[in-house]
Amino acid sequence: MSEKHPGPLVVEGKLTDAERMKLESNYLRGTIAEDLNDGLTGGFKGDNFLLIRFHGMYQQDDRDIRAERAEQKLEPRHAMLLRCRLPGGVITTKQWQAIDKFAGENTIYGSIRLTNRQTFQFHGILKKNVKPVHQMLHSVGLDALATANDMNRNVLCTSNPYESQLHAEAYEWAKKISEHLLPRTRAYAEIWLDQEKVATTDEEPILGQTYLPRKFKTTVVIPPQNDIDLHANDMNFVAIAENGKLVGFNLLVGGGLSIEHGNKKTYARTASEFGYLPLEHTLAVAEAVVTTQRDWGNRTDRKNAKTKYTLERVGVETFKAEVERRAGIKFEPIRPYEFTGRGDRIGWVKGIDDKWHLTLFIENGRILDYPGRPLKTGLLEIAKIHKGDFRITANQNLIIAGVPESEKAKIEKIAKESGLMNAVTPQRENSMACVSFPTCPLAMAEAERFLPSFIDNIDNLMAKHGVSDEHIVMRVTGCPNGCGRAMLAEVGLVGKAPGRYNLHLGGNRIGTRIPRMYKENITEPEILASLDELIGRWAKEREAGEGFGDFTVRAGIIRPVLDPARDLWD
């Protein structure tokens, strides 16, 4: 993409304030421990507001009541979001019971939110419950270390219940990569788990004293499923198997979706193929990619700091050669692989180990007891009797994994009685939104609360045009940071202002093409009017098996994005 315009390896200039904050934090300690005891405010002050992100938390407030509280001369109702570190999304039933209890007793909203990063979040943790939540997680073998800010975030792994042996091997690598790239500072253990301060000096041999320039996301992918959306991530290991056994990985680097409205220096980007590596080099290569980005990433501008921008600035071949040098290997040519879809297989699937796996559709990943649909209670009851584990998917759904034939009926009965197996349309199964309002401070428009009724309307359009048995990969994200992964959807809505979105078209079903903006700053009725016409055309004019996104490109409705660094904004 960018060999024509290689730029400097290191960007000179004044460092951002985030770099100062990290340097002065004493390896992420700051004054968080002291701040915990300050009862005058429900939030964290100064640098601690940002430092807690390295410990897996974001400070938020309820935006629905922000103005009302301001009128009453009250500070915003501060509460923390906590995101668990859960490589590959696998969680034991014992762990599930513990998080269910905490969510019900110690959060404002009482819910568990499954995320498209294959983990769960608690929303609405008051300051007094912040230390207890970390201690609860630790008591069941979990933590929230490095699930936010400038680190390698939660490592994703394809939730593939068919190929159980291959999934087991890939999952082990996801865990190994996660552990290898964790920060070494003892700050987390000292602050949250009351572990003794050790006299030795902290060192961060991989991440460095100021950690990474920006967030960094990693996946392990098992083709033909691209459920984890590899092109949204900085570093991707695509599993290559021979005779059902994992032998190595294709490496793809430099994906990412975050943009800024109107800032043409920002762009979504698909990941670049570097080559194939045998298994034994996996950790060395992972470390080499991370340290290259650590040293070459832009620390003068956080909006231009992610790996995708580093690749474009220095050139893919230059970055790749540096990874080879640091890892002491030469990449082999990419091995053949292909993707056929991204969705989860809802319902029962039999694995090759004679165990059954039940994938439950959880709309927007929000687990709560609703009237007539006690989802949270139902999952708790299943957790009490299920001998296998649960797996959170990157589509915000939940797999009850490893169910023996003898237990199927019992688990299905609870799931059905709890509304966990209610029939939904293919369109709803393939739609997703980020959290957005009321808790996300960056939200510009509704997403999670908007999606269910929006999909009701889309379902009506699909029925009107005779394509109810089909689906379009459709996603809503409340702001251009892109947590809802709308910039890899066939139809992506990106929040612009309350009730208004940019409509993007032209992505594809398998998630390998960035969609282009079709209409800007439009309302739901305008979106539906556009989609009514386009779905009608797709229903009539498509070729056999042609997805909606591919159709919009072939029919000339939208120009495909071929090189997003140069043509996304054209």
From Swiss-Prot:
Disulfide bonds: none
GO cellular component assignments: sulfite reductase complex (NADPH)
Cofactor field: siroheme; [4Fe-4S] cluster
EC id: 1.8.1.2
Reaction(s) this enzyme catalyzes, per UniProt: hydrogen sulfide + 3 NADP(+) + 3 H2O = sulfite + 3 NADPH + 4 H(+)
Binding site for [4Fe-4S] cluster: C434, C440, C479, C483
SUPFAM superfamilies in UniProt: Nitrite and sulphite reductase 4Fe-4S domain-like, Nitrite/Sulfite reductase N-terminal domain-like
Keyword list, A-Z: 4Fe-4S, Amino-acid biosynthesis, Cysteine biosynthesis, Heme, Iron, Iron-sulfur, Metal-binding, NADP, Oxidoreductase
The keyword Zinc appears for this protein: no
NCBIfam families found in the cross-reference section: CysI, PRK13504.1
Family: Belongs to the nitrite and sulfite reductase 4Fe-4S domain family.
Purpose of the protein: Component of the sulfite reductase complex that catalyzes the 6-electron reduction of sulfite to sulfide. This is one of several activities required for the biosynthesis of L-cysteine from sulfate.
Protein name per its UniProtKB record: Sulfite reductase [NADPH] hemoprotein beta-component
Originating organism: Escherichia coli O9:H4 (strain HS)
